[in-house]
Amino acid sequence: MMDFDERVPVGSNMYLPGCTYYVSGTDFSSLPPFLPQTPSSCPMTYSYSTSSLPQVQSVREVSFRDYAIDTSSKWHSRGNLPHCYATEDMVHRECLSNPGTLGDMLSKNNSVLYHSNSSHTSNVYGSVGRNGVLPQAFDQFFETAYGNVENQPTEHPVDRATSKAPPPAESGSDSCRGTDETERCEETSSPEPSSGNNEDKFSGSSNGQKTRKKRCPYTKYQIRELEREFFFSVYINKEKRLQLSRMLNLTDRQVKIWFQNRRMKEKKLNRDRLQYYTTNPLL
């Protein structure tokens, strides 16, 4: 195949790759040359008269600005219907007859469509709108989109404050209900203490307010004696338990619960020790 620059007219000898001979140009004398350089070298006949058609400029001569911003002389359909437009629109159309740039046309079109009153200034870019970036022609969009939101906080501040006041009271009542329910659950779930510990069930019963039962930790002396007894016997009998309760000033139930918790703790320690020694073969 030949390159684009090496193409020659059909009038000269042309070599066809599929053939073994040259084709002379006399066989194609009725055809015009290949890719004519001028429009006049390739005349064409039309079934209609071309004199009635308007003269169209070349594509290279028409720029984007001339195409986008067209004067009123190019659009004949608008001039034929003057009765469909109001007088005010006609005045603005005259103002838009020769705009300078595409941005001026767009800004002025917006001013015609949305701000056609007499108080609107001709210099759109000189006056900046509410948003600080776009011209005043775009203020209507911000008024419709954000106007209601901006006006809402300043309408009824007192009503909003009064409407927000009741929820804390309800939350406080809910928290009180929650504390009452937890206290009831604790009372039902925990077994009743012995007769010697009934007086410290509620410390604030005289005030009429229910308070949580205070934890009474064991003293160092009590813990030392209990640990000593646990060292000799993990399971304590009833006689020894009563003896410890009288000696340490504790209830029988407190001593029993301490031994139960201590056995669970010892079991956990033994499990941890076994796991530690089995995972380390060097020990």
Curated annotation (Swiss-Prot):
Gene3D superfamilies: Homeodomain-like
GO biological process: embryonic skeletal joint morphogenesis; regulation of transcription by RNA polymerase II
Keywords assigned: Developmental protein, DNA-binding, Homeobox, Nucleus, Transcription, Transcription regulation
Transmembrane segments: none
Top-level taxon of origin: Eukaryota
InterPro entries: DUF3528 (IPR021918), HD (IPR001356), HD_metazoa (IPR020479), Homeobox_CS (IPR017970), Homeodomain-like_sf (IPR009057)
Protein location: Nucleus
Biased composition (Polar residues): 188-209
PROSITE patterns: HOMEOBOX_1, HOMEOBOX_2
DNA-binding residue intervals: 211-270
Disulfide bond entries: none
GO molecular function, one term: RNA polymerase II cis-regulatory region sequence-specific DNA binding
Keyword Isomerase: no
Bias (Basic and acidic residues) ranges: 177-187
Family: Belongs to the Abd-B homeobox family.
Protein role: Sequence-specific transcription factor which is part of a developmental regulatory system that provides cells with specific positional identities on the anterior-posterior axis.
Protein's name according to its UniProt entry: Homeobox protein Hox-A11b
The gene coding this protein: hoxa11b
